[in-house]
Curated annotation (Swiss-Prot):
This is Large ribosomal subunit protein uL3m. GO terms for cellular component: mitochondrial inner membrane; mitochondrial large ribosomal subunit; mitochondrion. GO terms for biological process: mitochondrial translation; translation. It is linked to Combined oxidative phosphorylation deficiency 9: A mitochondrial disease characterized by failure to thrive, poor feeding, hypertrophic cardiomyopathy, hepatomegaly, and psychomotor retardation. Death in infancy has been observed in some cases. It comes from Homo sapiens (Human). SUPFAM superfamilies: Translation proteins. Component of the mitochondrial large ribosomal subunit (mt-LSU). Mature mammalian 55S mitochondrial ribosomes consist of a small (28S) and a large (39S) subunit. The 28S small subunit contains a 12S ribosomal RNA (12S mt-rRNA) and 30 different proteins. The 39S large subunit contains a 16S rRNA (16S mt-rRNA), a copy of mitochondrial valine transfer RNA (mt-tRNA(Val)), which plays an integral structural role, and 52 different proteins. Belongs to the universal ribosomal protein uL3 family. PANTHER family: 50S RIBOSOMAL PROTEIN L3, LARGE RIBOSOMAL SUBUNIT PROTEIN UL3M.
Length: 348
């Protein structure tokens, strides 16, 4: 924001010339103290890291920070070697933590009986557990785990946020989500989460913010039929018509009317996982999910009653690549999926 920076520079020069009040407290003519004072007033905003850097030094600093972020992520790849928390077995009624994934797009997929299904690709990028909160410090019912997804640049993050991630030994994340868990599903902060946390054949719930459509009428927003195009109709073709009766003398709350459409959080329940790619951490879920491409979505085990008992066959509390389990193949498929390399026609 060059306008804000120019205004701050002018204000610093004016305050630096003052001989009493704030200018005397900070030292007359001392612009460095003035800048520190102004930055202290805006501690929640991004840092001006490139203020005293030349154009040649900016790429060097960015590369240096990028290498440091990669080293921090590599140090967290083996959480079981660094004094892990005790791992408890699965019990009926247990709730695991979820993931934060990036929506890549959609593609077709075929089953062995020839049916075509459209799936959405969700990629897990640098997803880590950030904080554990016991149920005594939460709502008294369930514990929570804070999970961060997708590493972002630290140059535009506030100092207080950077301090939180520095204590964890992780680079800052783009978004943080909270998941309710049971006590036996607690995971140590700093543990990475992978797409193998889920398995093909299970069902998940996906939450994301829908695409904003702006202010829309009732035909687009609610699917109203509209009114006749001819036969004396004037300027009412796409209008809702009557919104109430004359007896009540008011409009009932919740009546479908024009308004802002989209840009709200929605959840798709009971989406089947058809395929898992362990190399690129991609989850193939059935159907569409809310949000645009490259948006971050929240994925967790389905809470529908029909799928609650499927958790006993899943990695609990999560998948550890350095655990006792055998190494997973690059692709995991549901038993009904026709694999890309399999023949399309077979003869009995």
């Amino acid at each position: 924001m060059p306008g804000w920076r120019l205004l701050t520079q002018v204000g610093a020069q004016v305050l630096g010339r003052l001989g009493d009040g704030l200018g005397a407290a900070l030292g007359p003519g001392n612009r460095t103290h003035i800048w520190l004072f102004v930055r202290g007033l805006h501690g929640k905003s991004g840092t001006w890291w490139d203020e005293h850097l030349s154009e040649e030094n900016v790429p060097f600093i960015k590369q240096l920070v990028s290498d440091e972020d990669k080293a921090q992520l590599a140090s967290k790849l083996c959480p079981l070697k660094d004094e892990p928390w005790p791992i408890h077995p699965w019990e009926p009624g247990s709730f695991r933590v979820g993931l934060i994934a990036l929506k890549l797009g959609m593609m077709p997929l075929w089953t062995k009986d020839g049916q075509k299904h459209v799936v959405t690709l969700l990629q897990v990028q640098d997803c880590h557990v950030l904080k554990y909160t016991s149920k005594e410090n939460c709502n008294g019912k369930m514990a929570t785990l804070s999970v961060g997804g997708k590493t972002v640049s630290r140059f535009r993050k506030a100092t207080s946020i950077l301090e939180f991630y520095r204590e964890l030994g992780l680079p800052p994340k783009q978004t943080v989500k909270i998941f309710n868990i049971t006590d036996n599903a607690a995971i140590k902060p700093g543990t990475p989460l992978y797409a193998a946390h889920f398995r093909p054949g299970q069902y998940v719930d996906v939450t994301a913010k829908t695409i904003g459509k702006g202010f829309q009428g009732v035909m687009k927003r609610w699917g109203f039929k509209g009114q006749p195009a001819t036969h004396g109709q004037t300027k009412t073709h796409r209008r809702p018509g009557a919104v109430a009766t004359g007896d009540i003398g008011r409009v009932w709350p919740g009546t479908k009317m024009p308004g802002k459409m989209g840009n709200i959080y929605r959840t798709e329940y009971g989406l089947k996982v058809w395929r898992i790619n362990t190399k690129h951490n991609i989850i193939y879920v059935n159907g569409s999910v809310p949000g645009h491409k490259n948006c971050l979505v929240k994925v967790k085990d389905s809470k529908l009653p029909a799928y609650k008992d499927l958790g006993k066959n899943l990695p609990f509390p999560t998948y550890f690549p350095d655990g006792d389990e055998e190494e997973l193949p690059e692709d995991l498929y549901d038993e009904n999926v026709c694999q890309p390399g399999a023949p399309s026609i077979t003869f009995a």
